[in-house]
Amino acid sequence: MAAQGSASGQIRFLGYGACALAGTLWGTGFYWGRLALDEMNVEHMVLYRFLFACLGMAPVMLGRRARLTAGEWRTMLLTAAFGIPIQFLLQFHGLVLTTVSHASLMVGAMPVLLAAAAAIFAGERLDRIGWLALCASTAGAAMVVLGGDRATTGRETPSLLGDLLVIASLLVALAWILLSKKLMQTHSPPVVTAYTIYSGTLMLVAWNLGSWLLKPVTHQKIEPLPLAHVSLTAWIALAISGLLCTATTTLLWNWGIHHVPTSRAGVFLNIEPALGSILGVELLGERLGPYAWLGGALILGAAITLTTRGHETEPAVILE
């Protein structure tokens, strides 16, 4: 009995470690994306990221095939469209127009937005403290967007449009999560995530290829996919974004969440906005004004309040 209890404790410890590592890797996603965006446009960067993610999810695709009905395929394709091209193109076009620290703080509102969406669309109960947390998170986001320091010692400055694009990507992510939840009633989270990543990556390929082929018609300046002139730094950033920040985090989170209480594991989602904003300030020379710091504290405080009170926000289906 003692040995069994010790083994259970070790598994639980590893589960917390897996969730913490996933949250930490998620927190670096905007930083690596910013490095890659110095050498290519958003569409190319997101495509490369998910091509690397496909490599990381290959064992799941090869080892755990799923039989989807025609209706499930339609839901899957809609889920992939929301979850990959629409969400990430909006998010990183926003990052181009704002800073890593601002974008990271915005993402901190995700647990609260998810709880609100579950209450509105899925009939889950959100108590008075939950609604207060939602109001605090909304006020915090408004303070970051409208009251943040528009001056920075780095190369980028935050803008209202950039911050709003990041917020729009979070709303798109809510639609993706609610659709994914339906698929996960009959299929495991890793399988649904793998199929979503592969389907969404094919959509990104079609978008990039179609934009390039239609260049003579649209008269837009579309550059070919960069290869030879991409630096080693950018390739490393892209590989880390896809293999570690997307594929590995998904597998770590899905394993960890099944060995620890969901309400406790959810707190590790809050590592992402905190670490992301720190990386932006410390490594990229960005600055946050006093209102942005206060707004960020409200966002994180609201998220921690929800994720430590036992309210399950379905963190197993979150994809970064």
PLM region spans:
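Specific alpha-helical transmembrane segments that line the substrate/conduction pathway
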Residues: 44-55, 83, 88, 92-134, ...
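Cytoplasmic-side transmembrane-helix entry/capping segments in multi-pass membrane proteins
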Residues: 19, 71-80, 126-139, 187-196
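Juxtamembrane helix-entry segments on the extracytoplasmic side of multipass membrane proteins
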Residues: 11-16, 39-43, 47, 68-74, ...
